[in-house]
Amino acid sequence: MSKFIEPSVEEIKLEKVYQDMGLSDQEYEKVCDILGRQPNFTETGIFSVMWSEHCSYKHSKPFLKQFPTSGEHVLMGPGEGAGVVDIGDNQAVVFKVESHNHPSAIEPYQGAATGVGGIIRDIVSIGARPINLLNSLRFGELDNKQNQRLLKGVVKGIGGYGNCIGIPTTAGEIEFDERYDGNPLVNAMCVGVINHDMIQKGTAKGIGNSVIYVGLKTGRDGIHGATFASEELTEESESKRPSVQIGDPFVGKKLMEATLEAITFDELVGIQDMGAAGLTSSSSEMAAKGGSGLHLRLEQVPTREPGISPYEMMLSETQERMLLVVEKGTEQKFLDLFDKHELDSAVIGEVTDTNRFVLTYEDEVYADIPVEPLADEAPVYILEGEEKNYNTSKNDYTHIDVKDTFFKLLKHPTIASKHYLYDQYDQQVGANTIIKPGLQASVVRVEGTNKAIASTIDGEALYVYNNPYEGGKMVVAEAYRNLIAVGATPLAMTDCLNYGSPEKKEIYQQLADSTKGMAEACDILKTPVVSGNVSLYNETKGTSIFPTPIVGMVGLIENVDYLNDFQPQVGDKLYVIGDTKDDFGGSQLEKLIYGKVNHEFESIDLSSEVKKGESIKTAIRQGVLSHVQTVGKGGLLITLAKLSAHYGLGLKSLIDITNAQLFSETQGRYVVSVKSGKTLNIDNAIEIGLLTDSDNFKVTTPYTEISENVSDIKQIWEGAIAQCLTTQD
């Protein structure tokens, strides 16, 4: 008889306890069919987390199959802890993005901190040393005190973990809209570097080999965290605060260093982070990938307090833990290593030839499950979508007040400088950061070489909401352009798909169409998807977030020497590359004037993106250009203002466009500055002005003139977010 008081198999069925764990009636019946009997309490919990949306992708898996996952540089694609891409010289870059949305909505500091810790361990589990962190964040408008609290907590959590563990946060993006009220998006990305011969996989194989647990002792924090992340946020969500994990960056640092030492041992067979679904997912997934079985003796698991049941051990998401499989007879070598790093560790089981996942506690069986159905046979749901009716009429922008619109957009938190927030992150630790957070992708040198990794993280919501297919293409192209802007060759990408409930027809269609667009862009831009994450059910009180796909992309710079003088200077001429059209559907201008986005916009020309990108990259590397900036939210006038304010340079420009086109967001455009004495030879490049040593920012069109002090623009742009957060306290 069990020493733990739990519902019986009959009670689980009759009282539908499985529903509270996240299993539907049909899923419960499928579990019964797989087992040939009714599952006990621990088994029900194990299936519920492994078949949760967060772990199984049961609503998104058909769409993920569209993505190209192989390519010239890809060494390891989806299926492991992170993607791995070759960068030459027997080296590779390892990267991935993950969401921690629901936990951050309930406990913003810990939700964000553990999101950072988890993505770091994903990179380390491959054997790579992390070189930088990035993040993509979404919050509701800052006139709401709850959103202010969430923003402050998330930023402190990101900085608190990353700064303590010693990894620089070098790039990111933050946007604000009322559709994220109470449901922030916190997507964390990590990039690492590894030698080819050190690449690890999360696999359990070799009959009789031992399973080692290392890291923090298991507690009751984060139980059913994966299930919680697969539900809508409701008024009852606050009661699920225990589902939010607690991070310890100092233990995280010890675990990282110990793991990176352990991968040098030839006796290491496989390794995986204990992330979502904790010990359950790491162990069962390793067994599935190894084509083997596992027997775990749970009384050997290090626990924080007495009386923790097998159910709690298996579903706990206590942070800073790794699971290793090592060759039989070499266990002490690993235990001694972990002891040296002051980490708890224990041998908790062994690999078997049964293809079953068996859990015992003091010789009593608490679970006996076939591995493959548990890890790989979660139900997949193909639902019916519903196309959105597009508004093909045109809004009127002929009478806008250019100056008033300019300043309203400049100080909107989505467009305003994020330095007030990013300054809370350590951007330089490790001393390899070349380009810090600002107007472009970040660039981090590969230590001991003249190479560098450029990385960016970008998201799109308004355009995806307006037209999911075209918006999906746009978000991939935006990341591509940001890498081109620092002279990098884009290599591959990771994605995080943040959407509402897929059980709603319109949202399911958004997911279907946007991933189709993303896949098409990946094909044409040659940026395969090597890792990723899906976060659904992002809804609060029945209101869904905007569909928000996030793309993290990395690129290679073979020689960083050209970056030594890659900064705009007085006297540099300015050019815009790409046509400016009447593109206002989904723009910040449409949202500002009409309060919503509901109009079509032109499709993006991906072939043109490639041609322009190659030309610009060549011009950068040949030393022709001193700065490249993509034209993004707010349009050309805002882009020029940000350039001027960021570098403290005057600007004089003459542009032949209409007042409204100053704020058009036509895709595929760049603003470039050409070094004095150099000639730009790129198709469709139009000279629009030059940089000066004055404090004057002057833009003239046939219809208007903007003339403002650069110092005033800088003060408004850089001070907007701080003002929102301080005046509302």
UniProtKB/Swiss-Prot annotation:
Pathway: Purine metabolism; IMP biosynthesis via de novo pathway; 5-amino-1-(5-phospho-D-ribosyl)imidazole from N(2)-formyl-N(1)-(5-phospho-D-ribosyl)glycinamide: step 1/2. SUPFAM superfamilies: PurM C-terminal domain-like, PurM N-terminal domain-like. One of its GO terms (biological process) is 'de novo' IMP biosynthetic process. InterPro entries: PRibForGlyAmidine_synth_PurL (IPR010074), PurL_linker (IPR041609), PurM-like_C_dom (IPR010918), PurM-like_C_sf (IPR036676), PurM-like_N (IPR016188), PurM-like_N_sf (IPR036921). Mg(2+) 1 binds at residues 98, 533. The keyword Chloroplast does not apply. Its main location: cytoplasm. It is an enzyme of class 6 (ligase). The keyword Nucleotide-binding applies. Monomer. Part of the FGAM synthase complex composed of 1 PurL, 1 PurQ and 2 PurS subunits. Belongs to the FGAMS family. This is Phosphoribosylformylglycinamidine synthase subunit PurL. It comes from Staphylococcus aureus (strain MRSA252). The lineage of its organism: Bacteria, Bacillati, Bacillota, Bacilli, Bacillales.
